[in-house]
């Protein structure tokens, strides 16, 4: 066992003394059992994580019952909804790297034999997943689960995206103070990740098809008995996997990553999943080309439209059959998935999900009646995005196939929000928000406030937005993000002028500014070099080491330090 490094031999007597002092070693024979880390992310200020201490205690009991010794540690967490629209959002994506590094540090410093990961929201799930693939120690994931959907006084289903859009509606005068306060108090009624197909739930659903979590991980409610039983079963499965030496890199292959994108397409998941899945590919040593995502989109139907793209919540999806029903439906179309690869259950993806039929075809459409024959995400290329950009086409009005408009440019999120709120932004505009990428932000902040304000003011079909920043999973409308290269790295998005005509072509998956190459080259020669906005602390180090969105926005050591 890996843990023999810290508990076997005379030279490890001091370490054994310290282990006895923890109180986790109950019997002398415990030193002969696997040591299992519980990588938790309990934190009081994140509603998706306030109940994780309870779940960790259930995991501890089950791990001990299964014949191993549990040791819990905690990571940090940032709630994107609370951090939205201010300096706090600069820390959200960078927190993913801290979580991965922190988990790696504890796991390798103490030579654990296996790891039970308990994530839930935003950057915690991908951060832990990066650590799992990096350390390649037997691992299993069981998230905290989604919250129930809210309900307004008028009986309307609510999620957090409803609240963000309500801000725009209230400021625009189409919502009363009473209605606004009612939504505020009822949008998030329980603990758990936000109830729609936002980043947290997108990633927790993807964990099922990747093969690192048990079925229904993405949809069983945080407050349900099923969630607690799932924790127990996952603990037993992990101890079995330690015995069989089943490791994350045995599971997370290029085919598994393909299937993650396919499920994302079928469910119209968050654009952030592209960023995170590319980061996971990097940790797994898998060379994953962005263009592969469009190939997957072309063969994957869009089967389930969930909030913010509809009124359906994650609980509705669960009642309709959950992710297993969607996987089972996709398996019926040959070539869509790779169903015969191994998963954390020790069984194949096919064995985990075959026969799990759709229970409500209004929520999960069958293959013969998809929302669209192609998936809900697209990668756009063109002279504005030579290395790609991402749009959630599932969140765009189906009638819109092409959008042409005049650029109105802003070099920060805050400037754009002010212009939208004071009606400077009008119908026919393409709002360009730049210098908000991984380096430029820094931290690639989410642009939920401007997109929500656009939709909330009734301009969702008439105004587009492009940015080198990213979007919340709650974003909908004509919103193109992750434009690469970013402005801070010299990307052409930094060369756009007010009034330039921009074309977003969803059919041909292109993003272009109607300006000649000669003019762009002239503008490039006149552009001043970017200077980092933050000079000290973590964000300064992040700015120096972070890479482009098209490679997952990961931090990399400079090549000159690792060249042989």
From Swiss-Prot:
The UniProt entry's GO CC annotations, sorted and at most eight, read: cytosol
UniProt EC number:
4.2.1.9
Question: Cross-referenced SUPFAM superfamilies, in alphabetical order?
Answer: IlvD/EDD N-terminal domain-like, LeuD/IlvD-like
Post-translational modification N6-carboxylysine, affected residues: 123
Q: Name one GO biological process term.
A: L-valine biosynthetic process
EC category: lyase
Q: Where is the composition biased (Basic and acidic residues)?
A: 1-10
Which reactions does this protein catalyse? Answer: (2R)-2,3-dihydroxy-3-methylbutanoate = 3-methyl-2-oxobutanoate + H2O; (2R,3R)-2,3-dihydroxy-3-methylpentanoate = (S)-3-methyl-2-oxopentanoate + H2O
Could you list this entry's UniProt keywords, alphabetically sorted: 2Fe-2S, Amino-acid biosynthesis, Branched-chain amino acid biosynthesis, Iron, Iron-sulfur, Lyase, Magnesium, Metal-binding
Which residues make up the binding site for [2Fe-2S] cluster? 121, 194
- Pfam families, per this entry? ILV_EDD_C (PF24877), ILVD_EDD_N (PF00920)
Catalytic residue list:
472 (proton acceptor)
Q: Secretion signal: which residues?
A: none
Per the annotation, how and in what number is the cofactor bound?
Answer: Binds 1 [2Fe-2S] cluster per subunit. This cluster acts as a Lewis acid cofactor.
The pathway it acts in is: Amino-acid biosynthesis; L-isoleucine biosynthesis; L-isoleucine from 2-oxobutanoate: step 3/4; Amino-acid biosynthesis; L-valine biosynthesis; L-valine from pyruvate: step 3/4
Q: Where is this region: Disordered?
A: 1-20
The entry's Mg(2+)-binding residues are 80, 122-123, 446
Give the GO molecular function terms.
2 iron, 2 sulfur cluster binding; dihydroxy-acid dehydratase activity; magnesium ion binding
Cofactor dependence is on:
[2Fe-2S] cluster; Mg(2+)
> What NCBIfam families would the database entry show?
ilvD, PRK00911.1
Quaternary structure, per UniProt, is: Homodimer.
Q: What family name appears in the similarity comment?
A: Belongs to the IlvD/Edd family.
Task performed by this protein: Functions in the biosynthesis of branched-chain amino acids. Catalyzes the dehydration of (2R,3R)-2,3-dihydroxy-3-methylpentanoate (2,3-dihydroxy-3-methylvalerate) into 2-oxo-3-methylpentanoate (2-oxo-3-methylvalerate) and of (2R)-2,3-dihydroxy-3-methylbutanoate (2,3-dihydroxyisovalerate) into 2-oxo-3-methylbutanoate (2-oxoisovalerate), the penultimate precursor to L-isoleucine and L-valine, respectively.
PANTHER family linked to this entry: D-XYLONATE DEHYDRATASE, D-XYLONATE DEHYDRATASE YAGF-RELATED
Protein name as catalogued: Dihydroxy-acid dehydratase
Species of the source: Staphylococcus carnosus (strain TM300)
Gene that specifies this protein:
ilvD
């Amino acid at each position: 066992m890996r843990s023999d490094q810290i508990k076997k031999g005379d030279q490890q007597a001091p370490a054994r003394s310290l282990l006895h002092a923890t109180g986790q070693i109950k019997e002398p024979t415990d030193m002969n059992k696997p040591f299992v880390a519980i990588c938790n992310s309990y934190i009081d200020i994140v509603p998706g994580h306030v109940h994780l201490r309870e779940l960790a205690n259930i995991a501890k009991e089950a791990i001990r019952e299964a014949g191993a010794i549990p040791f819990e540690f905690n990571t940090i967490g940032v709630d994107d909804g609370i951090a939205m629209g201010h300096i706090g959002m600069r820390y959200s994506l960078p927190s993913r790297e801290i979580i991965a590094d922190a988990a790696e540090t504890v796991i390798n410093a103490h030579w654990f034999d296996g790891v039970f990961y308990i994530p839930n929201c935003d950057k915690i799930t991908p951060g832990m997943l990066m650590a799992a693939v990096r350390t390649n120690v037997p691992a299993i994931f069981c998230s905290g689960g989604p919250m129930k959907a809210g309900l307004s006084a008028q009986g309307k289903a609510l999620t957090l995206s409803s609240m963000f859009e309500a801000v725009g509606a209230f400021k625009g005068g189409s919502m009363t103070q009473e209605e606004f306060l009612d939504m505020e108090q009822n949008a998030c009624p329980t603990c758990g990740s936000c109830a729609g197909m936002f980043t947290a739930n997108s990633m927790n659903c993807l964990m099922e098809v990747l093969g690192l979590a048990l079925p229904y991980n993405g949809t069983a409610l945080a407050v349900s008995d099923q969630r607690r039983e799932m924790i127990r079963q996952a603990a037993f499965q992990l101890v079995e996997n330690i015995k069989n030496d089943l490791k994350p890199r045995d599971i997370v292959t290029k085919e598994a990553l393909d299937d993650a994108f396919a499920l994302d397409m079928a469910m119209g998941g968050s654009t952030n999943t592209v960023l995170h899945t590319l980061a996971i590919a990097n940790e797994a040593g898998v060379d994953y080309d962005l263009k592969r995502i469009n190939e997957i989109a072309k063969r994957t139907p869009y089967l389930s439209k969930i909030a913010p793209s509809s009124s359906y919540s994650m609980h509705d999806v669960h009642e309709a059959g959950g992710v297993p029903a969607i996987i089972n439906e996709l398996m019926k179309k040959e070539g869509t998935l790779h169903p015969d690869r191994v998963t954390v259950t020790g069984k194949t993806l096919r064995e985990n999900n075959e026969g799990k039929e759709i229970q409500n075809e209004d929520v999960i459409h069958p293959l013969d009646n998809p929302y669209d024959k192609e998936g809900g995400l697209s990668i756009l290329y063109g002279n504005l995005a030579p290395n790609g950009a991402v749009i959630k086409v599932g969140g765009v009005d189906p009638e819109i196939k092409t959008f042409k408009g005049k650029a109105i440019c802003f070099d920060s999120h805050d400037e754009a929000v002010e212009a939208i709120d004071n009606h400077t932004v009008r119908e026919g505009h393409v709002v360009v928000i730049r210098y908000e990428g991984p380096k430029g932000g820094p931290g690639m902040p989410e642009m939920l406030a401007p997109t929500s304000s656009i939709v909330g003011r009734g301009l969702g079909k008439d105004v587009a937005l492009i940015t080198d920043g990213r979007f919340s999973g709650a974003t909908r409308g004509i919103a193109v993000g992750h434009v690469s290269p970013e402005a801070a790295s010299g990307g052409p998005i930094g060369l756009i002028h007010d009034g330039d005509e921009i074309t977003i072509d969803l059919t041909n998956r292109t993003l272009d500014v109607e300006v000649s190459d000669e003019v762009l080259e002239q503008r490039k020669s006149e552009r001043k070099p970017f200077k980092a906005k933050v000079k000290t602390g973590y964000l300064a180090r992040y700015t120096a080491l972070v890479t482009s969105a098209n490679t997952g926005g990961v931090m990399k050591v400079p090549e000159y330090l690792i060249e042989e």
